[in-house]
Regions:
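Active-site phosphate-binding and catalytic loops of NTP-dependent enzymes
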Residues: 78-81, 141-148, 225-227
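Residues immediately flanking
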Residues: 59, 116, 170, 198, ...
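Conserved G1/Walker A P-loop phosphate-binding module
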Residues: 1-139, 280, 290-294, 337-338
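Conserved GTP-binding G-domain of TRAFAC-class P-loop NTPases and closely related GTPase folds
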Residues: 160, 177-178, 188-340
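Extended hydrophobic secondary-structure segments that form protein cores and membrane-embedded regions
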Residues: 55-56, 112-115, 162-167, 249-252
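Alpha-helical scaffold elements adjacent to nucleotide-binding pockets in ATP/GTP-utilizing enzyme cores
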Residues: 67-71, 128-131, 135, 182-185, ...
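Conserved Switch II/interswitch segment of TRAFAC-class P-loop GTPases
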Residues: 28, 119-125, 133-177, 193-194, ...
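Intrinsically disordered, low-complexity regulatory regions enriched in Ser/Pro/Gly/Thr
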Residues: 45-50, 59-61, 94, 103-108, ...
């Protein structure tokens, strides 16, 4: 009831000068059918499907492709198929993307995985994040141009990066300079979720100590990772996200191999000590990462991308002197006043 009153007050305040009256659901004379809008939205979404674009960044050998395949229980990584986008932006870092349509229980998702082979693999990794920053901002620019088109598409194709999963090697020490510099720069333009790769190489105590040191380094360097406190919309969401923030970075293990454990088939890695069950939270935090990216926060990642990161870029671009937004025809996909 308190929440309903707050919503009514907010609505009244958002419409100054207009008289508003409310009839609560309990005061209605009969069934109206307002809740049916949820079914309408569900049917529309199931028919159209939706897009989700995830970037994976980290040095070679950390199991990026394997983890992505494990997340979506299918061969969706760059190594599993030919890329539909490939660009060598520098001598060291290349970007590849592959797209798949995944369907589950009638819901279709166009999943695009952007990989960054070559990142952090050189002796001199100076400015190795620049090609990635360039790619992320190029997708914002592409979306912005489509928005400004006079005869724009009913549904603008969305290639913006909704999430960047950053892989940290399980050193057990602290963040490296390259980790700090990358997350400081990318955290301003995209939602970053850091993970400790191949966490089975650490003991449980080593893992917890490493996670704590990483959180200290993130705070000391002003690095913002998803989900950010400032974007929490209500107390309930704040409590949920606080638990996630206390668990970051997730210590993960990826595999596409199944093993028999107590008569059940489980995804896991076989070691001389036994089977490490990927989806067993007592063994690693893969399930927590999966729940965050897919089951609980996927739509929020898309919303933060559109309402925060893209909006910041859009406002900056429209305020730049080389934009003139006077009415006019579009030529070659750009407004006639575009000088960029």
């Amino acid at each position: 009831m308190k929440k309903e009153l707050e919503m009514e007050l907010q609505l009244c305040q958002s419409l100054p000068g207009q008289q508003m009256s409310f009839i609560r659901g309990t005061d209605l004379f009969g069934y109206v059918g307002i809740e049916a809008v949820l079914d309408q939205m569900r049917r529309k979404t199931m028919k159209a499907g939706f897009e989700f674009n995830i970037m994976v960044v980290g040095q070679s050998g950390l199991g990026k492709s394997t983890l992505v395949n494990t997340l979506f229980k299918s061969k969706v990584s760059r190594k599993s198929c030919m890329p539909n986008y490939a660009e060598e932006i520098s001598k060291t870092v290349r970007l590849h993307s592959v797209s798949h349509v995944i369907e589950e229980k009638g819901v279709k998702m166009k999943l695009t995985v952007i990989d960054t082979p070559g990142f952090g693999d050189q002796i001199n990794n100076e400015n190795c994040w620049e090609p990635i920053v360039k790619y992320v901002t190029e997708q914002y620019e592409k979306y912005l141009r489509e928005e400004l088109h006079v005869n724009r598409k009913k549904r603008i194709p969305d290639s913006r990066v909704h999430c960047c999963v950053y892989f940290l090697p399980a050193t057990g020490h602290r963040l490296r300079p390259i980790d700090i510099e990358f997350m400081k720069r990318l955290g301003k333009i995209v939602s970053i979720v850091p993970v400790i790769a191949k966490a089975d190489t650490l003991t449980i105590d080593e893992r917890q100590e490493f996670k704590e040191r990483i959180r200290q380094d993130l705070a000391a360097n002003g690095i913002q990772v998803y989900p950010q406190k400032e974007y929490d919309e209500d107390p309930e969401e704040h409590l949920i996200n606080d638990r996630i923030r206390e668990s970051i970075p997730f210590a993960v293990v990826g595999t596409d191999k199944e093993h028999q454990v107590n008569g059940n088939k489980v995804l896991g890695r076989k070691t001389k000590w036994g089977i490490i069950e990927v989806e067993n939270v007592a063994h690693c935090e893969f399930a927590n990462l999966r729940d965050l990216l897919i089951r609980s926060h996927l739509q929020d990642l898309k919303d933060v991308t559109h309402n925060i990161h893209y909006e910041t870029y859009r406002v900056r671009r429209l305020n730049e002197s080389n934009w003139r937004l006077s009415p006019g025809p579009l030529e070659n996909g750009a407004r006639s006043g575009w000088n960029g």
